[in-house]
Amino acid sequence: LTDMAEPPIAELEALDQRAAGTISELGLSAQTIDLLRDRAHLKAYYLNDPAGAVALLEEGIALPTIDPKTKAQLKLDLGDVHLLAGDMWDASLLYSQVDLDFKYDMLGHEARLRNAKVSFYAGDFLWAQAQLQVLKSSTSKLIANDAMELSLRITDNLGLDSNSVPLSYFARAELLRYQHRYDESLAVLDSLNEAFPGHALGDDILYERYRIAYARHRYEEAAGHLTKLLELFPFDILVDNALLDLGRLYEERLNDTEKAMKTYERLLFEQTGSIFVPEARTRYRRLRGDDLDGPPEPAAPSPQP
């Protein structure tokens, strides 16, 4: 249901009520906490009810029977909802708590990455950079890769003159996209292009336009943005991301197996050092008809809602 471009609100509300009924019947416990998280996600990202999501997550955090890691995950969820609602500092506080409590755990690394993004959105690029430095050596390849990409974006686009205005534009657009304010985000990206034509952020702008089109389920348009990125910026750090995302678009959304295979093959041969190679190889072999056990490797998540 939530995978539809415009899911009927009445059906989403009915789904929410069924989840509420199940939790009420079984009681809120460690066994039903995942259902509470799902319900909070539904409220925040599909029913435009972040306040309702906050109330649910706070109820879960207050539950005395859940383990520390589950409580930390609930705090991350709550931080995400606060960020969605525009409460950046509440989000940062929650991320900081998880970072402090799980400093040497993957949860702590994820919390620090999210906190670095908050600093990035707020325009505090140097502080974001300081947080990212530690994460580059994370044992999670995805976290380390995300930290490296954001760190390089800051380094490459501040420039020797330390002009942070273009990057501030982009950070604003990215935050608006995260908050589902897509038209506003696109308007900021347009303004960035007009004010700073030919800026080094050109590849990032195209990738952001792809993420917005994907979130709106406009898959042909999304594929167009990725194709343009690959044509105009063939040596950029986002190329492997773009190739994997484009292959998945062809495979899962546009039902074009031939183009999907060609895109995965290009990633395998042109981006041999990418962390996405294992997933691309698995997907390529599956489409080729090889006998593989298990689903494709979930190495790279789809763009955020």
What are the residue ranges of the model-derived segments?
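Acidic, polar-rich low-complexity tracts and alpha-helical solenoid repeat scaffolds
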Residues: 1-305
